[in-house]
């Protein structure tokens, strides 16, 4: 079974919020009170969603900051697991040491 690719929260912001609501990145930036470069970098997957940005997005879209931080956290965990797989796979579970 093929594993799905890791989706950056910026892609979700773009595809599930900005496009369907017909909002420009410029307008979103102005409404949130953040630089347009921050919004553009998030959408392109070049920047993480910080706690500050998560709170601003939650106020604007009416969802929770935990939603946005959860997306970012899930993305970061998957990226870390992929990048350090060889290192992590050599760690033995605690119960394997006792055997």
What are these regions (language model features)?
Residues 24-29, 39, 57:
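Short alpha-helical "recognition helix" segments of helix-turn-helix
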Residues 46-59:
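Short, basic-rich loop-to-helix N-cap that marks the start of a DNA-contacting helix
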């Amino acid at each position: 079974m093929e594993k799905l690719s890791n989706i950056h929260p910026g892609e979700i912001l773009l595809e599930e919020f900005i496009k369907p609501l017909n909002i420009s990145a410029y307008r979103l930036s102005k409404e949130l009170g953040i630089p347009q470069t921050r919004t553009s970098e998030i959408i392109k997957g070049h920047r993480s969603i910080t706690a500050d940005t998560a709170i601003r997005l939650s106020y604007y879209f009416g969802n929770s900051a935990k939603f946005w931080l959860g997306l970012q956290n899930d993305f970061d965990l998957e990226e870390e697991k992929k990048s350090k797989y060889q290192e992590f796979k050599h760690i033995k579970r605690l119960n394997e040491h006792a055997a």
